[in-house]
Amino acid sequence: IMGKVYLKTKYDNEMKMEIPHNHNFASAMFGFREMAAEIVPYHLIDDIYDDFKREDIALDYIDQCNVLFNKFGVTPHIPDYPDVLKPFLGRKIWKDTINSISRDENKWSAGYFVKPAVRSKAFTGKTISSIKDLMGCGNHAEDYEVLVSESLDIAAEWRCFITYDEIIDVRPYGMIIDKSRKGYLYHYDAQVLNSMMESFVSWEDRPMACSMDICVTKDGRTLLVEFNDAYSLGAYGLADIYYAKLISARWSQLLGVKDEYHF
């Protein structure tokens, strides 16, 4: 049976109409529409929770998607840095806690890149080189684990979209993060990317769809930035239909059903 595609929407007062909640959901909506999916708009997870079946897909944010996965006893997880791809990191990465960093000047002044070890935690990753960079990272009530890495001097970044062991597209995103970057002047090394993919397909528990973010450093190295799961992911200009297929591949793998959009 074909499942439904649930689309998170919001009411736009200016236009007096329901619109997709963000542009990623809009892109996926157009992609699923092209493949003749039945699309059902909704506002809150509570509105669809009881009706939601394994065959269905929801276009929503990470935490909301997880509520639906949990209904079926599924907890999605992809490591940021899979073991088989560690040779491509080009930097040391280790675990620490946010409080231990804020207490130690040697740590908070070192210019390390710090991000929560658990995705849904308080802040997005950033470079910490002074005590004020820690503002907004702490949470006095709880000390939590962070991943710390040596800083990279990044010139350009790309998101490689992988569906069923193939790179579907590679989209630049560095300038979204930092307008001063001239990422278009750089290119990654295609041979390194091919080697990354050879390692990727040797990874036993690999996802059927995900993104592999890569970068080129100012000294010309092509390196792995991190992996991201595909069930709720920034599209960065990926063509609508490929974006929808990527989402479907991962949802069907996670919920153990046939991927109806794998054609």
Over which residues does each language-model region extend?
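A short, terminal or domain-edge coil/loop segment
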Residues: 95, 260-263
